[in-house]
Amino acid sequence: MPSHPKRFQINAKNYFLTYPQCSLSKEESLSQLQALNTPINKKFIKICRELHEDGQPHLHVLIQFEGKYCCQNQRFFDLVSPTRSAHFHPNIQRAKSSSDVKTYIDKDGDTLVWGEFQVDGRSARGGCQTSNDAAAEALNASSKEEALQIIREKIPEKYLFQFHNLNSNLDRIFDKTPEPWLPPFHVSSFTNVPDEMRQWAENYFGKSSAARPERPISIIIEGDSRTGKTMWARSLGPHNYLSGHLDLNSRVYSNKVEYNVIDDVTPQYLKLKHWKELIGAQRDWQTNCKYGKPVQIKGGIPSIVLCNPGEGASYKVFLDKEENTPLKNWTFHNAKFVFLNSPLYQSSTQSS
């Protein structure tokens, strides 16, 4: 009795299609694949156009569905040329590892993507070696975001259950020193700087780093708005700029600068945070970042504290309160006070 030919049927969430000698563009192919009528929603399509050694183009395609799609028509994924009478029939396979297929069709780089890649359990198969390979690939990524995406696709268990540690570790691995700020005005354009401020700057910036004291003196400058104190403070050299609050995260705070500028940070807030560490130029201390691990601060650099007069803003008014007498005595040993009565410049173009 003759045997019946085996009926074509593939039941899978992930399909791997190969179109040999297919001259269609990636864009035309994607449009036709998106238009296919299926009972299961499509979630992700990735197309790679590759040239054979003989110059003939072919396409690799990964299609991911929301659930399992049962394909019983081997011509279902055929593509049609819009300009001539030609059909392109693919080799159809169930993608056992969507991550492996995605990596494979990425190899030539000429790709087109629609939707969001869906991670599945088989994407992380292979045990320790696969995990190590994925970790190495993540370390070689060009950015934290790219590294996280690699881990999400290839080691989803670690992404799900160890995200907090991953996020913190990748922040350190891909840490970039903040770009140096370029002042719009040179320090020499400030022609009305009080002698106390000028002398403080010369005593610190006029020396090499080796000749500076272990814990240099800071300076607290109080003055009205638009007197130029911020621009002057920021024009002296490489610095950290802390405005309104303290953000000592490594993405914005650098251990490679010469001083800190603390601008419009209320004295009550600074007292609760790191008054003595910052104003006292203390070395090698830690700060706890919200939702992150403690950050090690190298320290040993002075701070220029800028404030306005009046209750709530003035450091003098704050320290003159009886309950702050011990802190006042400490601060007088670690910082100079300067009170501005006029702008630091002559031109009306500079203000802060």
From Swiss-Prot:
Chain span(s) of sequence motif RCR-3: 104-107
Outcome after substituting A147Y: 54% loss of interaction with RBR. Almost complete loss of oligomerization
Cofactor(s) named in the record: Mg(2+); Mn(2+)
Annotated positions binding a divalent metal cation: E50, H58, H60, D108
Cofactor notes: Divalent metal cations, possibly Mg(2+) or Mn(2+).
Record note on what altering E145A does: 14% loss of interaction with RBR. No effect on oligomerization
GO terms of biological process kind: DNA replication; rolling circle single-stranded viral DNA replication
SUPFAM superfamilies registered for this protein in UniProt: Origin of replication-binding domain, RBD-like
Motif window: RCR-2: 58-60
Sequence segments annotated as region (Oligomerization): 157-177
Impact after mutating K144A: 58% loss of interaction with RBR. 33% loss of oligomerization
Any matching Pfam family: Gemini_AL1_M
Active site: Y104
Motif RCR-1: where in chain: 16-19
One function term, GO molecular function aspect: metal ion binding
One annotated Gene Ontology cellular component of this protein: host cell nucleus
Domain of life assignment: Viruses
Keyword set, alphabetical order: ATP-binding, Covalent protein-DNA linkage, DNA replication, DNA-binding, Endonuclease, Helicase, Host nucleus, Host-virus interaction, Hydrolase, Metal-binding, Multifunctional enzyme, Nuclease, Nucleotide-binding, Nucleotidyltransferase, Transferase
Domain CRESS-DNA virus Rep endonuclease: 9-117
Residues the entry annotates as binding ATP: G223, D224, S225, R226, T227, G228, K229, T230
EC number: 2.7.7.-, 3.1.21.-
Subcellular location: Host nucleus
Family named by the database record: Belongs to the geminiviridae Rep protein family.
Role: Essential for the replication of viral ssDNA. The closed circular ssDNA genome is first converted to a superhelical dsDNA. Rep binds a specific region at the genome origin of replication. It introduces an endonucleolytic nick within the conserved sequence 5'-TAATATTAC-3' in the intergenic region of the genome present in all geminiviruses, thereby initiating the rolling circle replication (RCR). Following cleavage, binds covalently to the 5'-phosphate of DNA as a tyrosyl ester. The cleavage gives rise to a free 3'-OH that serves as a primer for the cellular DNA polymerase.
Domain notes: There are 3 rolling circle replication (RCR) motifs. RCR-2 is probably involved in metal coordination. RCR-3 is required for phosphodiester bond cleavage for initiation of RCR.
Protein name: Replication-associated protein
Organism phylogeny: Viruses, Monodnaviria, Shotokuvirae, Cressdnaviricota, Repensiviricetes
